[in-house]
Amino acid sequence: MNTSKASKKRKAVTRDVEEEAGVFSGDELNTGNLDGALSDNAHDLSSDEDESDSEVELIDDFSDEEDEEEEDVLDSDEIPSDGEDSAKKKSNAAPGELGAVIDDDDDDDDESPSEEEQLNYRIEKDANGNDRFVYDEINPDDNSDYSDVDENANTIGNIPLSFYDQYPHIGYDINGKKIMRPAKGEALDALLDSIEIPKGWTGLTDPSTGKPLELSQEELELLRKVQMNEIPEDGYNPYEPIVEWFTSQQEIMPLSAAPEPKRRFVPSKHEAKRVMKIVKAIREGRILPFKPPTEEDEEDDTIVKYDLWADEAERKDHPMHIPAPKLPPPGYEESYHPPPEYLPSRKERKTWEEADPEDRDREFLPNDFGSLRRVPGYENFVKEKFERCLDLYLAPRVRRSKLNIDPESLLPKLPSPEELKPFPTACATVFRGHKGRVRTLAVDPSGLWLASGGDDGTVRVWELLTGRQLWSVKLSEEDPVNVVRWRPGKDALILAAAAGDDIFLAVPPIVDPAMEKASLDILDAGWGYAASVPPPTPAEANKKNNPPKWMRPSSSLADSGVCAVIPLRYVAKSLSWHRRGDYFVTVCPGSSTPASVAIAIHTLSKHLTQYPFRRRIKGGGPPQAAHFHPSKPILFVANQRSIRAYDLSRQLLVKILQPGARWISSFDIHPTSSTASGGDNLIVGSYDRRLLWHDLELSQRPYKTLRYHRKAIRAVKFHPGGRYPLFADASDDGSLQIFHGSVTGDMLSNATIVPLKVLKGHKITGELGVLDVDWHPREPWCVSAGADGTCRLWM
């Protein structure tokens, strides 16, 4: 190069770059000028640099080897032709080599463009001969705002690669050239990659480029820190000293111990003034709580109002149209704060949860939320609305004609209890003297005396009205007196009592001598008949079920008034007299009692005992009680679950009653049965708290079942004689219940049963209450025996 060109501005820059095509600003390189700049005029550059404020800057010393490498790298295609404009000349240095920009100043320096005004594109001809602008790749330097060009980066944008599945390319670069799809390795390459895993290998594919996704060194370091439970951020200290912006110590004493000012307890005067102003304005009408809309607001043309039903013509309902039934209104159990009695217990909740959804009585359980803001969303809301919709359009509808019947007219016309008086209402006399429970009692046919027996083994006779004890006898030291009954009839006064395995017949010395002598004559008449009976043969004597022989009592019992003893060998719990007073029946309900001797009929005039049943009564367990019919030769025998009627004259089974009770405790026959007043009626008490009324002509099932007691019913009794249509029952809940039960002779009408009164006075002792009850023969009075050791007269 000539020395005259030493005054030209030259700039040489050397730096280490990656093996990429560099992009430099400035004039295009000329081959001749480049050779001269690198070889001949090296000293000129340094001299010019020192002498003047030239823009040529030499950063590094260049060797001849670098010049030769740079010349070799230059390609012929990168050298512009002579026809191109010198202002647009541009060449790219080889990657990794020297990048130099030399501004050649011609003689006319003003005509050369500045470095900022130089163009970053070149013009080429496309296939149609039109001009086409080609932009060079940007290769930023250290001072540039651009980042390094990533040759693996995809410039197609945020477009899914699935759009290019059917094409060999995956997008286009900035110049519109296709970016070809990267080649995929075969099975052998995949095997080699799995054996020699490069650093940063993930086994994933980058969705934007289609190439294997590799992690950088920074990302690997971040993953290592996370795996080792280290802090990912550099320079972060998790153990910095605590700065207590607020104290962690609980302060007990106040910050200020000054007394509270009075203004905090006195209403504010300023607020009172403001409130009074508002009140005055409301009274004067200057402030209205509701301001009605004016006519201008109502006639506002900008507001368009639509009437959806303006063109809808009124249509009559179909003749067969049936409106949908309304849902029942919600009850107390659906409240968010229901009363406590509507909330289920734990047992009820568990039973409801364990039951099948179809077997549940309701779809939800009542809950108490306390306040409305705590009520959550109803989980079955959508289900209920869906089922309601199904019912509306799937369930058939039927018109049901309502019967205009007064419900009161359907109920039986029962008289008022006030109209059915007299009946016992209060306790008049209390009989005290027994030690332990009083198990049984009976009122004599005259209505003057009361006999009772209890656990102390004694039988006591009381004066009914005064409660004074007149006579007492000790029948047993160990066994209680289970039952006492007076012989019917007023011609004699004979008392039968069952204690232990024996039956005792006594004449209490409480009457006049004539009555006492008549009673003793009736008892003594049987001894002569018993002596005239021939003794049993040896074969009959060896039988186990031979009837017992009547015996005379011991001297001590005879002095007390006992006249005869019947050894039954089993405990009798029931004793009932025939209406004529010559027969009485006993029942031994023990499980160890043989069936053939459980029921015995005794003849008073002959001192004879007979066993009418050879076998156990079928069905229902052992017998519990037995009574004679008041007017017919019929014996009623009750076992645990049924009652059988036997005709003694014909020795036939007449009828079987099925009360439906689990265990019958007692029963009684109406005193006017089989007379002009009506048919056979009887009442049954059971240990399962039921009181049953049976009409034998109506059915073998009970006519009425009354459940008014909370515990077992021990005894039931009709008023004797039929003068008063009353009957009573005694229960272990400590109460007696008085009923009105009238029977008419009209076969088309049924018996009328009306509850009258509940009598309470006995104390419950040992889970036992009232054990026996009996009526006065002429008055509407009743007497009860309790487990508390007392007897009570109710009138």
UniProtKB/Swiss-Prot annotation:
InterPro entries: BOP1/Erb1, BOP1_N_dom, WD40/YVTN_repeat-like_dom_sf, WD40_repeat_CS, WD40_repeat_dom_sf, WD40_rpt. The keyword Nucleus applies. Residues 1-12 have a biased composition (Basic residues). Its main location: nucleus. Keywords: Nucleus, Repeat, Ribosome biogenesis, rRNA processing, WD repeat. Residues 325-342 have a biased composition (Pro residues). GO terms for molecular function: large ribosomal subunit rRNA binding; ribonucleoprotein complex binding. Residues 122-133, 344-365 have a biased composition (Basic and acidic residues). Residues 1-133, 319-365 are annotated as: Disordered. It is found in: Nucleus, Nucleolus; Nucleus, Nucleoplasm. Residues 47-84, 102-118 have a biased composition (Acidic residues). WD repeats lie at residues 433-472, 476-516, 618-656, 659-704, 708-749, 765-795. It comes from the Eukaryota. GO terms for cellular component: nucleoplasm; PeBoW complex; preribosome, large subunit precursor. GO terms for biological process: maturation of 5.8S rRNA from tricistronic rRNA transcript (SSU-rRNA, 5.8S rRNA, LSU-rRNA); maturation of LSU-rRNA from tricistronic rRNA transcript (SSU-rRNA, 5.8S rRNA, LSU-rRNA). The keyword Repeat applies. Component of the NOP7 complex, composed of erb1, nop7 and ytm1. The complex is held together by erb1, which interacts with nop7 via its N-terminal domain and with ytm1 via a high-affinity interaction between the seven-bladed beta-propeller domains of the 2 proteins. The NOP7 complex associates with the 66S pre-ribosome. Belongs to the WD repeat BOP1/ERB1 family. Component of the NOP7 complex, which is required for maturation of the 25S and 5.8S ribosomal RNAs and formation of the 60S ribosome. This is Ribosome biogenesis protein erb1. It comes from Aspergillus fumigatus (strain ATCC MYA-4609 / CBS 101355 / FGSC A1100 / Af293) (Neosartorya fumigata). The lineage of its organism: Eukaryota, Fungi, Dikarya, Ascomycota, Pezizomycotina. The gene is erb1.
